Design a protein with these regions (language model features):
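Conserved glycine-rich cofactor-binding loop
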Residues: 12-14
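Conserved NAD(P)H cofactor-binding loop of Rossmann-fold oxidoreductase domains
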Residues: 81-86, 227-228
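Substrate-binding pocket helix/loop in short-chain dehydrogenase/reductase
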Residues: 89-90, 94-102, 188
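Alpha-helical segment proximal to the catalytic Tyr-Lys
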Residues: 118, 162-166, 216
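Catalytic loop of short-chain dehydrogenase/reductase
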Residues: 129-152, 157-166
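Short C-terminal tail/terminal secondary-structure segment
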Residues: 138, 219-233
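A conserved structural motif in NAD(P)-dependent oxidoreductases
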Residues: 192-203, 214
């Protein structure tokens, strides 16, 4: 795996940062972006690249992709992480908050797909993993914007995977449950059959596998990493 290039968005902290650290530890050259500025420091600390750019800003995404290509000449993989959209009473969420969620969760992936797919095609392949949520397919009123738009992300990932499979390009989603990147709540923990929050490194290692050659026959999938919290089979 050493020497391959991965771009991880919205990775200044939390799950995205954990994924970036794991990939660097496995020998990837890592480019990190975040809107907060933390991504610049993290990227440098991992011996890679760091950019300050929001994944909701098309020009910022273009700058991140161009900067990575300028430095390393290729991009082999992308991890699309994102922040947490507005929560609230279902019908009280404003149009503006729905539109912000759309930009953050779905359009950010679509825009980055447009930028990196031609790169993947020139290189003979590539892979993308999108960080979604366990509630994408079992909606939870606690996360209405996230549920609705990440369900759409599941459909998009399947459409993209089918369209570009012949070009040796893969896309998958990971659907995390409750992880220790956020403060633990007893009520949430009690919902989990394994009886605990997930550890960020557990998610990160799964993402690393999906990006690897060992997962070369996996595409268009929505993989639950949730300690068993979802009930459907």
């Amino acid at each position: 795996m050493t020497g391959k290039v991965v771009l991880v968005t919205a990775a200044g902290s939390g799950l995205g940062a954990g994924i970036a650290r794991e990939l660097a530890a496995q020998g990837w050259r890592v480019a990190v972006s975040s809107s907060s500025g933390k991504g610049e420091a993290l990227g440098r600390s991992l011996g890679g690249l760091g950019f300050t750019a929001s994944n909701t800003d098309p020009a910022g995404l273009e700058r991140v992709v161009a900067g990575t290509l300028d430095a390393w000449g290729r991009i082999d993989a992308v991890v699309n992480s994102s922040g947490h959209p507005t929560k609230g009473e279902l019908l009280a969420i404003s149009d503006e908050d729905w539109h912000r969620g759309l930009d953050m969760i779905l359009l950010s992936v679509i825009r980055l797909s447009r930028l990196v797919t031609p790169v993947f095609e020139r290189q003979g392949g590539g892979t993308m993993v999108n960080v979604s949520t366990f509630a994408a397919f079992e909606p939870d009123l606690a996360f209405p914007v996230s549920c609705a738009l990440r369900a759409a992300l599941g459909s998009y990932a399947k459409l993209y995977a089918d369209r570009y499979a012949k070009a040796n390009i893969r896309m998958n989603n990971v659907l995390p449950g409750f992880f220790d990147s956020l403060p633990e709540k007893e009520a949430a923990k009690q919902r989990v059959p394994l009886g605990r929050y997930g550890r960020v490194e557990e998610l990160a290692k799964t993402v690393a596998f999906l990006l690897s050659d060992g997962a070369g026959y996996i595409t268009g999938q929505n993989l639950r990493i949730d300690g068993g919290i979802t009930r459907s089979v």
